Amino acid sequence: MIPLQHGLILAAILFVLGLTGLLVRRNLLFMLISLEVMINAAALAFIVAGSYWGQPDGQVMYILAISLAAAEASIGLALLLQLYRRRHTLNIDTVSEMRG
């Protein structure tokens, strides 16, 4: 069995990588991918903590987090497709400019 500290350190590293990608990248698709990495890091922390204490709650939270991530990804990708069709770019700086 993997020790609790190793699993939580891995989850923290993944979360920080996702947060860095979310803050640094200006492309909305990469920001969505970084958000997915952050959700998976939190789900990994639930799994590790649940297996350490022998409780199934971590696995239940993992299923909830994965279903939430799937819904978020499908809605996000649909919005990105519509945005790309209208503006022909996914750069957040050009999208945030107002027309008028």
UniProtKB/Swiss-Prot annotation:
EC assignment: 7.1.1.-
Localisation per UniProt entry: Cell inner membrane
GO biological process, one term: ATP synthesis coupled electron transport
Membrane topology: Multi-pass membrane protein
GO molecular function annotations of the record: NADH:ubiquinone reductase (non-electrogenic) activity; quinone binding
Gene3D superfamilies according to UniProt: 1.10.287.3510
TM helices/strands, residue ranges: 4-24, 28-48, 60-80
GO cellular component: NADH dehydrogenase complex; plasma membrane
Keyword Mitochondrion appears in the UniProt entry: no
InterPro entries: NADH_UbQ_OxRdtase_chain4L/K, NUOK/Mnh_C1-like
Pfam families: Oxidored_q2 (PF00420)
Coiled coil: none
Keyword entries, A-Z: Cell inner membrane, Cell membrane, Membrane, NAD, Quinone, Translocase, Transmembrane, Transmembrane helix, Transport, Ubiquinone
Record field: catalytic activity: a quinone + NADH + 5 H(+)(in) = a quinol + NAD(+) + 4 H(+)(out)
Subunit field text: NDH-1 is composed of 13 different subunits. Subunits NuoA, H, J, K, L, M, N constitute the membrane sector of the complex.
Record NCBIfam families: PRK05715.1-1, PRK05715.1-2
Function: NDH-1 shuttles electrons from NADH, via FMN and iron-sulfur (Fe-S) centers, to quinones in the respiratory chain. The immediate electron acceptor for the enzyme in this species is believed to be ubiquinone. Couples the redox reaction to proton translocation (for every two electrons transferred, four hydrogen ions are translocated across the cytoplasmic membrane), and thus conserves the redox energy in a proton gradient.
Record HAMAP family: NDH1_NuoK
Protein name per UniProt: NADH-quinone oxidoreductase subunit K
Native species: Serratia proteamaculans (strain 568)
